[in-house]
Design a protein with these regions (language model features):
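ABC-type nucleotide-binding domain
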Residues: 13-237
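Pre-NBD coupling/linker segments of ABC/ABC-like ATPases
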Residues: 2-15
């Protein structure tokens, strides 16, 4: 992501329904010829799940990454509850959005510290509760030092499924009304996949959720589906 400056004098975002709208949004990465997304128009109803499907490089991740302003579009505007996100304090915007990605960033610290990073005022009890909802508590308790277990640089001592559950626990602890979910394509075994899916169901309940979907079960559960191809939305339903 490029360095978007936070303007401290801008107002905090006011979330009511967490409706999202993209109006004529186009974006091109530096040193690339083609636009990653081109004149995207979409409306997402608050507290619903919207799935984006399409081949790799179609523009799905770009759409997701524009919402917390990891990048700003060259054209068009993005609104949350009718507020242009460029006119909102950046810290306030990002506090209201949780990203659960396959590229989770973990620190060489304890499991507890890695989860509490999402909400520095959270109590130990709240951390444990978030882990229970994320189906992470069970495996954490089996570790040599439980929540005080050091996980190594970027969580090297954890499996893919365990990392994902840590990421989900973090998002649950953050209590944000908007969830961005980039489903892991890495193959989890059937049991881990079921556990992760249940954790995601707990996380996304009553939240506005945008998901880059790779699993049929997610697509079935979505309230709306957008098909993305070559930076365009070619179908929805």
């Amino acid at each position: 992501p490029i360095n978007i400056k936070n303007e401290n004098n801008l107002p905090s975002i006011s979330i009511k329904n967490s409706d999202i709208e993209f109006k004529d949004v186009s974006f091109k990465y530096l040193n690339t010829k083609d636009k990653a997304i081109n004149k995207i128009n979409l409306k997402i109803q608050g507290r619903s799940m919207t799935a984006f499907v399409g081949h790799s490089g179609a523009g799905k991740s770009t759409i997701i990454n524009l919402l917390p302003r990891f990048y700003d579009p060259q054209n068009g505007k993005i609104f949350i509850d009718d507020q242009d996100i460029k006119n909102i304090n950046l810290n306030s915007l990002r506090k209201n959005i949780s990203l659960v990605s396959q590229d989770i960033i973990l620190f060489d610290d304890t499991i507890r510290a890695n989860i509490a990073y999402a909400n520095d005022s959270a109590t130990d009890k709240e951390v444990v509760k978030a882990c229970e909802f994320a189906a992470a508590d069970e495996f954490i308790k089996k570790l040599p030092n439980g929540y005080e277990t050091m996980i190594g640089e970027n969580g090297i001592r954890l499996s893919g499924g365990q990392k994902q559950r840590i990421s989900i626990a973090r998002a649950i602890l953050k209590h944000s009304p908007i969830i961005l979910l980039d489903e892991a394509t890495s193959s989890l075994d059937a049991e881990s996949e079921k556990i992760v899916q249940n954790a995601i169901t707990n996380l996304t309940k009553d939240k506005t959720t945008l998901v880059i979907a790779h699993r049929l079960s997610t697509i079935h559960n979505a309230d709306k589906i957008f098909v993305v191809k070559d930076g365009l939305i070619i179908n929805s339903g």
